[in-house]
């Protein structure tokens, strides 16, 4: 008797907005309390956009109605709002429902990592210049910065959702814990994954708010961000110190690269999933074997890599997986099945995932970022007023390219810090009111990163882009939480920062 074919649901859900970037997008993060998204580019620019989710959803619904009425057969045009983002464009014309709050040339070279406070008050960035900057999300001004020691490039930056510290991982497997107030170093852990790069970091709050999990090469490790109180000699498998061994627990070799991970329910912390280089999603149970090894695996996409994963935070035992084939897979981890598939891009991989303040899925690759509509069943439970018409058309016809000017304010250049070494901290452009943004001065330097071919590997871009360029700086703002008893869930979301990826750092 043959195997039963499991039917996978090809989703009819569409994005409400799509940002298309002229330069490669390396990182993005959603504000946890307001409809804002901060994006960081390969050129060192950081931009912040605000979007009106209700208006954009209404525009999408109207476009669907038009498609129904005219019965258009062609499916080449998009129904959702599209925003072209060019960091060099100082006077962008944006469609209604979208506002550019600020843009800045924050780092020399590319932006390596990006993080935000659990309340959205501050945003943290680190560039190829190894300068870590903390900026006020409301004003966009840099309030603190520090140049990090060592030549290793940072691959991951996470802000604790509960305490005032940052956790940072680099290319050689070093974890640095910093005080998020003054950016001073509090603790350092070395060679966690045998000297391999840190692919992902997330909090293990069920065990302790100080416990974190890191992924690197073919192993998973969990450790304490605090310094060990005493030496507890353990079996030495290499040249690690006793203190390190007493503070780090490492899994068995998985014989496949572990690229990303997340807890299905970050508060419960009973099930952990990891995206693998060969296209499977491995399932781990801390209570079963203390994370020594995976228990089961779910086949997602053979021959592709799972580059990013995030919980849906909907109490449905599901996670979203972003794959190198440009598809988004919703996986029921309890049943071990794919329950929904969405298409992010036909050319680019999905390298980043996040949830916005109303739990919309946000997917990002090197050329675009999409904020997806909330499914009808989820939206009806929330207290938001954005009613989404969940018709069964999957068509992509009918243009929805409203070019009405958004409200942008004139950029004000504000001297944020007086460090002689930081031109890039002085030029900020804040966009509020109805004026177009003013100029942000500062030479662009040598940024050879116009990504004409979206198939270019990130590792090649790093080589080209990690060259010192001139700096500028700018301001951010804030956003608000949803009412539906989701505050605790949002707390979960903030524990899993979404940017990831070892491949883009290879060869540096």
UniProtKB/Swiss-Prot annotation:
Bias-annotated ranges (Basic residues): 478-492
Stretches with biased composition (Basic and acidic residues): 455-466
The UniProt record lists the keyword Transmembrane: no
Keywords, sorted A to Z: Nucleus, Repeat, WD repeat
Region (Disordered): 376-508
Cited InterPro entries: WD40/YVTN_repeat-like_dom_sf, WD40_repeat_dom_sf, WD40_rpt
GO cellular component terms, semicolon-separated: nucleolus
Compositionally skewed regions (Acidic residues) per UniProt: 380-393, 441-454
WD repeats: 62-105, 106-145, 149-188, 193-233, 253-294, 345-382, 431-472
Subcellular location: Nucleus, Nucleolus
Domain of life: Eukaryota
Low complexity compositional bias, start-end: 407-419
Example of a GO biological process term: positive regulation of transcription by RNA polymerase I
Protein family per UniProt: Belongs to the WD repeat WDR55 family.
Protein name, per record: WD repeat-containing protein JIP5
């Amino acid at each position: 008797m043959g195997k039963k074919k499991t039917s996978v649901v090809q989703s009819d859900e569409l994005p409400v907005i799509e940002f298309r970037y002229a330069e490669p997008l390396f990182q993005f993060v959603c504000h946890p309390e307001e409809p804002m998204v901060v994006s960081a580019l390969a050129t060192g620019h950081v931009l912040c956009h605000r979007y009106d989710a209700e208006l954009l959803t209404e525009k999408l619904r109207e476009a669907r109605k038009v498609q129904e009425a005219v019965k258009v057969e062609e499916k080449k045009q998009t129904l959702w709002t599209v925003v072209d983002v060019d960091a060099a464009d100082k006077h962008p014309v944006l469609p209604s429902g979208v506002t550019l709050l600020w843009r800045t040339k924050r780092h020399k070279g590319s932006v390596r990592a990006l993080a935000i406070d659990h309340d959205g008050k501050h945003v943290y960035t680190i560039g190829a210049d190894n300068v870590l900057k903390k900026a006020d999300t409301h004003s966009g001004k840099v309030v603190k910065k520090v140049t990090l020691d060592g030549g290793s490039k940072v691959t991951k930056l996470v802000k604790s959702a509960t305490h005032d510290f940052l956790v940072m991982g680099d290319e050689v497997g070093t974890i640095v814990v910093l005080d998020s107030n003054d950016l001073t170093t509090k603790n350092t852990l070395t060679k966690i994954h045998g000297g391999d790069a840190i692919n992902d970091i997330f909090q293990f709050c069920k065990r302790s708010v100080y416990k974190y999990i890191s992924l690197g090469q073919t192993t998973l490790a969990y450790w304490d961000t605090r310094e060990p109180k005493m030496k507890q000699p353990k079996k030495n498998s290499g040249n690690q110190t006793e203190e390190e061994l007493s503070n780090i627990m490492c899994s068995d070799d998985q014989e496949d690269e572990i690229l990303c991970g997340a807890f299905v329910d970050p508060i419960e912390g009973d099930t952990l999933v990891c995206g693998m280089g060969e296209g499977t999603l491995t399932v781990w149970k801390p209570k079963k074997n203390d994370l020594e090894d995976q228990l089961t695996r779910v086949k997602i996409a053979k021959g592709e890599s799972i580059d990013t994963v995030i919980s849906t935070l909907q109490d449905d035992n599901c996670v979203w997986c972003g794959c190198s084939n440009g598809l988004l897979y919703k996986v029921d981890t309890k049943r071990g099945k794919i329950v929904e598939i969405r298409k992010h891009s036909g050319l680019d991989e999905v390298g980043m995932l996040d949830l916005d303040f109303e739990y919309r899925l946000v997917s990002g690759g090197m050329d675009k970022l999409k904020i997806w509509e909330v499914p009808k069943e989820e939206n009806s439970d929330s207290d938001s007023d954005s009613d989404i018409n969940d018709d069964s058309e999957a068509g992509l016809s009918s243009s929805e390219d409203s070019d009405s000017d958004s409200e942008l304010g004139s950029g004000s250049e504000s001297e944020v810090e007086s460090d002689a070494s930081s031109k890039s901290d002085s030029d900020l452009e804040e966009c509020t009111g109805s004026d177009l943004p003013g100029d942000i001065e500062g030479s662009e330097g040598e940024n050879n990163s116009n990504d004409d071919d979206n198939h270019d590997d990130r590792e090649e871009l790093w080589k080209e882009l990690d060259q010192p360029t001139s700096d500028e700086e700018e301001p951010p703002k804030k956003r608000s939480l949803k009412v539906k008893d989701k505050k605790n869930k949002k707390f979960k979301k903030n524990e899993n920062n979404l940017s990831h990826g070892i491949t883009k750092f290879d060869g540096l």
